[in-house]
């Protein structure tokens, strides 16, 4: 009987070993498959781009995702529903893969999956409490659709999405249960109820005898019975395992044993040998880590050398369980889940909100400063600029609100007889672009003419309508209910501004889609800026200047600032980049422009002698010569020898000093044109036509974009223009050649026209006076400006007085009134049009001069024919005497 029982036990053990080995291999294979799936998911999420084709965005462009279209769709679905919590949702899967690779599997599968989903949703809700940055491309928050859905419940009581302290409290309340759910679903916590009851005591020595007695009481079975029993046992075991794996099995009842089984002792090993009690020091509690439990290696089940090796702690012997409890057999024979590891404890940690793509400059400023080669000058640190504020996202930019507005806009257009479909919506920080694909036969001019009607019907302040270049669509731009502010710091510290290869990079602002706009003044090569008072023109000039100061040293770029208003640019007086003090006198402004023209001509002579075509070639040649320790020379013929008649040559050596860029900034062109229009226009025209190769560039701004200020000559030589808000369509056409600037919103909202004529809407950044003053104060500590007196000193004998036909009497005084009186007394003509033509000024200015002469008794009031008499002796009368 004993031998028969031993044979039966041996066959059962062999079947168990084989079944267990197969299941371990399947689990390991599933673990590696899960690792591969995780790698693909991480690759898809890391290369996610909102502009890739997906279920929520239709485009003909090729996907930029690393996994192609499938990866783009997967990443879009996860980002749309979970937001940044998609990364957190993948962490439990990492723990699952590690456990499966070890050949084990989890119990309570459905419960863990449910807690995983709940934890991911709660993590999304916690992230949605964090205000989304202005660079967030999705209409939902950082937690996606699920996060916004959870926050709608507290919003029912507060009336709006949680913000401030309330949002922080909610984020903490969501984070704790989310962390617990994710950690539990990963298998890092959640010990079975049997193991949590109490530590298992040491097995009694009579346990082996009890098992032996039970085996001896069994009837002797033949080979056929053993085979059929084995097949039935394998069938029921597999069935119970599958039912438990998919959650279809009933929860095992809590079982009570006379003496609980100790994993460190193997009763089957004691069937043929006496039981030796273990020492207390070798006892391992079930709650400890698996690696610690494997310190004590138990003997094999049967002690035979032919048995395959496997871990004794990953199975339980069948002899100690009732034969009629098949579900419990499968449950107890199942591999135990791996205990938690410290490396996976971050599964429930909170993910920080994303920041705008900052460049390396922001990171390097904490380590070292930007110092030039000589170590004398340090570029200003970026912390002088204000940080962007975390503003709660606009509820009107949600997907539902945008879809509703698109349908409403289609209805408005259909009311005016324009049929079409809104094919795409691009929400931005200030305005939202709705791309309309008109029906065949609809003219774009017809839709553009409905801009005011569209704004009225949509209850908007203004609406701008323009054709989208390169697409069969018409763009309709409507302002957002809540306007987001663009800060200069996020543009200066962005990767686009830092990594650009442009020479004179200027941060202009952000597009409708939130992309940074960095323009190169060296390629423009000159810039015309126009806009009414309060439109953001002066702030834009400050941002352009700060962009140059944050990127270039004084030996690389020098500035000449002309500010007739004496308020806007005077704050920069004293920085090392200036070639002269800020020019506020209009007469000295003419002198400064003429010096710039002479400097341009001198640079052309130098470049011609060396044989280069532009300033970059000149500086490159100088750097190469300095690196090699050579001198740049040129051999020229100076004449002939009188005795031999041979040509005489001399070697001319050039000064090896690189030429910096020169940027001339004119803040108010209208005032200069009023005082000395012809001289200003002539100097600006020469600079605009020729100064590009010499490294001299002009930024000219005006608040009166009329044809007498922005003349045809100036427009022809300034292909790059920026228009802020203007008052009429005529002014918009004067600047850009088309309407649209009158529909801008002000406060930095601009239309940027590059050299090719393509117009782009840009939202300019804001920089306060305090930020400018701090940067200027820092630059003043870096060095003293080296002014050139020749810039504002006129050594030439000028007799034109600013007009085309002036005489020597006009040069005696710099006052326009004295010049006008001299013209009237000399020529004997006292009319407004005559004074206007002689002085080259505007009609209103000339009329005011005539009225002043009348008040001072120089001329008489106009008679019925408009004629005026000169009441004082004229120059001809005095000469005749």
UniProtKB/Swiss-Prot annotation:
Predominant location category: membrane
Function: Essential cell division protein that coordinates cell division and chromosome segregation. The N-terminus is involved in assembly of the cell-division machinery. The C-terminus functions as a DNA motor that moves dsDNA in an ATP-dependent manner towards the dif recombination site, which is located within the replication terminus region. Translocation stops specifically at Xer-dif sites, where FtsK interacts with the Xer recombinase, allowing activation of chromosome unlinking by recombination. FtsK orienting polar sequences (KOPS) guide the direction of DNA translocation.
Keywords: ATP-binding, Cell cycle, Cell division, Cell inner membrane, Cell membrane, Chromosome partition, DNA-binding, Membrane, Nucleotide-binding, Transmembrane, Transmembrane helix
Domain comment quoted from the record: Consists of an N-terminal domain, which is sufficient for the localization to the septal ring and is required for cell division, followed by a linker domain, and a C-terminal domain, which forms the translocation motor involved in chromosome segregation. The C-terminal domain can be further subdivided into alpha, beta and gamma subdomains. The alpha and beta subdomains multimerise to produce a hexameric ring, contain the nucleotide binding motif and form the DNA pump.
Ribonucleoprotein keyword on record: no
Assembly information from the UniProt record: Homohexamer. Forms a ring that surrounds DNA.
Organism field: Rhizobium meliloti (strain 1021)
Record's subcellular location: Cell inner membrane
Pfam families: FtsK_4TM, FtsK_alpha, FtsK_gamma, FtsK_SpoIIIE
UniProt-annotated binding residues for ATP: 534-539
Domain of life from the UniProt record: Bacteria
Stretches for region Disordered: 194-221, 339-362, 793-813
One Gene Ontology cellular component annotation held by this UniProt entry: plasma membrane
Any one biological process term the GO annotation gives: chromosome segregation
Family of the protein in this entry: Belongs to the FtsK/SpoIIIE/SftA family.
Transmembrane segments: 26-46, 81-101, 114-134, 169-189
PANTHER family in the cross-refs: DNA TRANSLOCASE FTSK, SPORULATION PROTEIN RELATED
Domain FtsK: 514-733
Topological category with respect to the lipid bilayer: Multi-pass membrane protein
Regions of this protein lying in the Cytoplasmic compartment: 190-881
A Gene Ontology molecular function term of the record: ATP hydrolysis activity
Name assigned to this protein: DNA translocase FtsK
């Amino acid at each position: 009987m004993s031998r028969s029982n031993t044979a039966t036990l041996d066959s059962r053990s062999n079947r168990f070993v084989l079944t267990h080995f197969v299941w371990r291999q399947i689990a390991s294979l599933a673990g590696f498959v899960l690792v591969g799936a995780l790698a693909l998911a991480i690759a898809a999420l890391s290369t996610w781009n909102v502009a890739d084709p997906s279920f929520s965005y239709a485009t003909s462009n090729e996907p930029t995702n690393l996994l192609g279209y499938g990866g783009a769709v997967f990443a879009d679905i996860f980002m749309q529903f979970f937001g940044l919590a998609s990364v957190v949702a993948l962490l439990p899967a990492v723990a699952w893969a590690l456990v499966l690779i070890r050949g084990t599997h989890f119990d309570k599968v459905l419960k863990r999956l449910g807690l995983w989903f709940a934890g991911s949703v709660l993590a999304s809700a916690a992230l949605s409490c964090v205000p989304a940055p202005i660079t967030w491309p999705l209409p939902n928050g950082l937690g996606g659709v699920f996060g916004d859905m959870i926050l709608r419940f507290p919003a029912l009581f507060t009336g709006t999405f949680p913000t401030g302290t309330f949002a922080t409290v909610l984020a903490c309340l969501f984070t704790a249960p989310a962390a617990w759910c994710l950690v539990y679903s990963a298998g890092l916590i959640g010990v079975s109820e049997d193991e949590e009851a109490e530590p298992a005591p040491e097995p009694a020595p009579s346990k082996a005898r009890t098992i032996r007695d039970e085996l001896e009481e069994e009837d002797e079975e033949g080979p056929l019975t053993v085979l059929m029993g084995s097949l039935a046992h394998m069938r029921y075991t597999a069935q119970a395992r599958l039912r438990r794996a998919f959650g279809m099995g009933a929860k095992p009842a809590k079982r009570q044993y006379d003496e609980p089984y100790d994993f460190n002792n193997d009763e089957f090993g004691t069937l043929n040998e006496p039981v030796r009690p273990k020492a207390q020091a070798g006892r391992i509690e079930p709650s400890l880590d698996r690696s610690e439990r494997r310190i004590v290696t138990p003997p094999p089940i049967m002690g035979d050398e032919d048995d395959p090796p496997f871990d004794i702690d990953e199975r339980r012997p069948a002899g100690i369980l009732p034969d009629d409890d098949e579900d419990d057999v499968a449950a107890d024979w199942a591999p135990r889940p791996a205990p938690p590891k410290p490396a996976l404890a971050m599964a429930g940690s909170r993910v920080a909100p994303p920041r705008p793509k900052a460049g390396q400059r922001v990171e390097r400023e904490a380590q070292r400063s930007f110092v030039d080669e000589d170590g004398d000058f340090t570029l200003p640190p970026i912390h002088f600029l204000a940080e962007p504020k975390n503003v709660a996202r606009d509820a009107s930019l949600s997907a539902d609100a945008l879809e509703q507005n698109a349908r409403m806009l289609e209805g408005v257009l259909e009311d005016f007889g324009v049929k079409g479909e809104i094919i795409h919506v691009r929400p931005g920080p200030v305005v939202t672009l709705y791309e309309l694909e008109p029906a065949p036969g609809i003219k774009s001019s017809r839709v553009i003419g409905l801009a005011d009607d569209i704004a009225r019907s949509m209850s908007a302040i203004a609406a701008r309508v323009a054709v989208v270049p390169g697409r069969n669509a018409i763009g309709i731009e409507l302002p957002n209910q809540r306007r987001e502010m663009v800060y200069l710091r996020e543009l200066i510290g962005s990767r686009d501004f830092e990594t650009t290869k442009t020479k004179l990079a200027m941060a202009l602002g952000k597009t409708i889609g939130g992309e940074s706009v960095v323009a190169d003044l060296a390629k423009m090569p000159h810039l015309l800026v126009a806009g009414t008072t309060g439109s953001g023109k002066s702030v834009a000039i400050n941002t352009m200047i700060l962009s140059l100061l944050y990127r270039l040293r004084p030996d690389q770029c020098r500035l000449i600032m002309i500010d007739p208003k004496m308020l806007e640019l005077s704050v920069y007086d004293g920085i090392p980049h200036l070639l002269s003090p800020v020019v506020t006198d209009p007469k000295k402004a003419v002198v400064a422009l003429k010096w710039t023209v002479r400097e341009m001509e001198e640079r052309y002579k130098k470049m011609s002698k060396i044989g280069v075509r532009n300033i970059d070639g000149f500086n490159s040649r100088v750097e190469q010569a300095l690196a090699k320790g050579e001198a740049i020379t040129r051999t020229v013929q100076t004449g002939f020898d009188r005795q031999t008649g041979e040509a005489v040559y001399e070697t001319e050596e050039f000064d090896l000093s690189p030429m910096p860029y020169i940027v001339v900034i004119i803040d108010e062109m209208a005032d200069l044109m009023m005082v000395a229009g012809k001289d200003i226009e002539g100097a600006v025209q020469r600079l605009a036509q020729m100064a590009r190769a010499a490294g001299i560039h002009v930024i000219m701004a005006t608040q009166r974009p009329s044809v007498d200020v922005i003349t045809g000559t100036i427009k022809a030589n300034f292909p790059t223009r920026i228009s802020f808000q203007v008052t009429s369509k005529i002014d918009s056409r004067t600047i850009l050649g088309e309407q649209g600037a009158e529909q801008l919103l002000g406060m930095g909202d601009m239309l940027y026209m590059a050299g090719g004529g393509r117009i782009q809407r840009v939202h300019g950044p804001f920089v306060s006076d305090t930020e400018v003053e701090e940067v200027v104060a820092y630059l003043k500590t870096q060095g003293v400006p080296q002014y050139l007196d020749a810039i504002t000193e006129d050594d030439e004998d000028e007799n034109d007085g600013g007009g085309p036909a002036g005489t020597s009497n006009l040069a005696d005084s710099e006052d326009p009134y004295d010049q006008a009186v001299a013209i009237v007394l000399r020529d004997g003509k006292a009319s407004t049009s005559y004074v206007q033509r002689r002085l080259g000024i505007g009609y209103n200015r000339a009329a005011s001069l005539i009225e002043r002469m009348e008040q001072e008794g120089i001329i008489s009031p106009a008679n019925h024919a408009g004629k005026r008499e000169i009441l004082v002796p004229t120059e001809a009368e005095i000469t005749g005497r």
